[in-house]
């Protein structure tokens, strides 16, 4: 108690003068023996110098701790405050209960998770090359595992005999190589990306001047898919393919987009130049995977745009630079009409140069119908003007028949350019609507001024 009073005395200046200030108070010391409970008194003068030095050292240690306690406690309190703020922020944001995060700790089941991980081991990819004694209880399967070998194995608990066929990819376990699950065919991602997931916004009502062509294509594509019983009743096979040819801008690709919108079938769009690959055999492989993916669908429409990129007539230039392109075309010929049935697959092809296509590609059985997209007549051009001005802010007294008569030998793309230029004239004059004079100026600019850039006369020479 004496030492504690010395430490807490406010008039004490420090531990350096504790001995001189409180030495008279220490003349008589009373200490209690905690083992016996007796009180022992002795004179401080008889106390050893070492005991007094311990007292002063104890006082100096407490003072030093009090001196250094304040800065560390401030830092600790600051860090604790930041931690509390972050925890409160997390609770306010709801991250702890988010569906994308972990489940609450009370829902964790580490034992079952560990058991599940032990049961679900990764599988090896193999190819089932042969089935021994099919349709029996003792059926065995020959699987070829790449870089490992061939094995005769059975089925696992999760696989069904009706799901396994010869030539398909399967997943086998790493111990007994038993077939666990069937796998889908391996298809290049670049081929899968050719599938049009979203339906285009083009419809048949958005196409003008192609009424006859639309009817011919609908007979080949839509009628066999929507009413196959009509062909079964007559005992005939529907046409399998259509070739659309005509000058640029005549609406070939637009009709294909309208077909994709109209039918609920899977629509795959392929540009001919995409099948021209650097390495030998890559283009033919992509064609095989295209038709393989198309056969896996219930109904599919394959649209080859700019088919003249790979469908040109075969020739020998003595160098062999086009050999790979010709191999790709030969694969297309086989897929169109080979030993394997094409199934419910309709093929549309579009080109600007039908004169350079290989005759084997154009024969009946591969492309049964050829549809020519010629230049629209006066009625067709008038309809195209009305279609493109449907969403424009125009005056009511515009004579579209007059504008159509001023655009002879113009395609739908040319008329669309006229409508855009008329809108640009209205914007330049700071008007909110397009007048007939704007259309007349646009006709002079596009049809008359850009006549030297038009490729229509050049391409029309191939259709005469």
UniProtKB/Swiss-Prot annotation:
Residues that hold ATP according to the record: 246-253
Q: Where in the cell is it found?
A: Cytoplasm; Nucleus
Task: State the Gene Ontology terms under molecular function.
Answer: ATP binding; ATP hydrolysis activity; proteasome-activating activity
List, alphabetically, the InterPro entries matched: 26S_Proteasome_ATPase (IPR050221), AAA+_ATPase (IPR003593), AAA_lid_3 (IPR041569), ATPase_AAA_core (IPR003959), ATPase_AAA_CS (IPR003960), NA-bd_OB-fold (IPR012340), P-loop_NTPase (IPR027417), PRS7-like_OB (IPR048723)
Q: Name one GO biological process term.
A: proteasome-mediated ubiquitin-dependent protein catabolic process
Q: Which segment of the chain is annotated as a signal peptide?
A: none
Cross-link Glycyl lysine isopeptide (Lys-Gly) (interchain with G-Cter in ubiquitin): give the residues. Answer: 452
Output the superkingdom of the source species. Eukaryota
Keywords, sorted A to Z: ATP-binding, Cytoplasm, Isopeptide bond, Nucleotide-binding, Nucleus, Proteasome, Ubl conjugation
A matching Pfam family: PRS7_OB
Of which family is this protein a member? Belongs to the AAA ATPase family.
Its biological purpose: The 26S proteasome is involved in the ATP-dependent degradation of ubiquitinated proteins. The regulatory (or ATPase) complex confers ATP dependency and substrate specificity to the 26S complex.
Which protein, by its recorded name, is this?
Answer: 26S proteasome regulatory subunit 7 homolog B
Organism of origin: Arabidopsis thaliana
């Amino acid at each position: 108690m004496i030492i504690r009073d010395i430490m807490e005395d406010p008039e004490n200046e420090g531990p350096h003068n504790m001995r001189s200030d409180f030495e008279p108070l220490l003349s008589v010391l009373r200490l209690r023996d905690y083992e016996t409970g007796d009180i022992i008194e002795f004179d401080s003068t008889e106390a050893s110098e070492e005991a007094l030095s311990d007292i002063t050292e104890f006082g100096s240690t407490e003072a030093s701790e009090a001196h250094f306690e304040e800065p560390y406690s401030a830092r600790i309190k600051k860090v604790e405050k930041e931690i509390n703020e972050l925890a409160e922020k997390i609770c306010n944001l709801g991250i702890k209960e988010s569906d994308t995060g972990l489940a609450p700790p009370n829902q964790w089941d580490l034992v079952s998770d560990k058991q599940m991980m032990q049961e679900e081991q990764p599988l090896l990819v193999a190819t089932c090359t042969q089935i021994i004694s099919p349709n029996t209880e003792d059926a065995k399967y020959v699987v070829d595992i790449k870089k490992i070998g061939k094995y005769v194995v059975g089925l696992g608990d999760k696989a069904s005999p009706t799901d396994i066929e010869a030539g398909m990819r399967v997943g086998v376990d790493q111990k007994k190589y038993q077939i666990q699950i069937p796998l889908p065919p391996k298809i290049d991602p670049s081929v899968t990306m050719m599938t049009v997931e979203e339906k285009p916004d083009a419809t048949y009502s958005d196409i003008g001047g192609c009424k006859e062509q639309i009817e011919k294509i609908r007979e080949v594509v839509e009628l066999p898919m929507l009413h196959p019983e009509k062909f079964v009743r007559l005992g005939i096979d529907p046409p399998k393919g259509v070739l659309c040819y005509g000058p640029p801008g005549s609406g070939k690709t637009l009709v294909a987009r309208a077909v994709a919108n109209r039918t609920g079938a899977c629509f795959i769009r392929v540009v001919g130049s995409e099948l021209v690959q650097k390495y030998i055999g890559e283009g033919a492989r992509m064609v095989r995977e295209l038709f393989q993916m198309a056969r896996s669908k219930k109904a599919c429409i394959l649209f080859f745009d700019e088919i003249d990129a790979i469908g040109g007539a075969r020739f020998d230039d003595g160098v062999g630079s086009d050999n790979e392109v010709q191999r790709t075309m030969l694969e297309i010929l086989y897929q169109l009409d080979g030993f394997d049935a094409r199934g419910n697959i309709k093929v549309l092809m579009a080109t600007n140069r039908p004169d350079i296509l290989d005759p084997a590609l154009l024969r009946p059985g591969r492309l049964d119908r050829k549809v020519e997209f010629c230049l629209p007549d006066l009625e067709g051009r008038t309809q195209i003007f009305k279609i493109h001005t449907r969403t424009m802010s125009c005056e009511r007294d515009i004579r579209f028949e007059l504008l159509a008569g001023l655009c002879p030998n113009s395609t739908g793309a040319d008329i669309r350019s006229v409508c855009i230029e008329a809108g640009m004239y209205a914007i330049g004059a700071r008007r909110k609507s397009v007048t007939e004079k704007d259309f007349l100026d646009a006709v002079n600019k596009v049809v008359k001024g850009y006549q030297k850039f038009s490729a229509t006369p050049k391409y029309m020479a191939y259709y005469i």
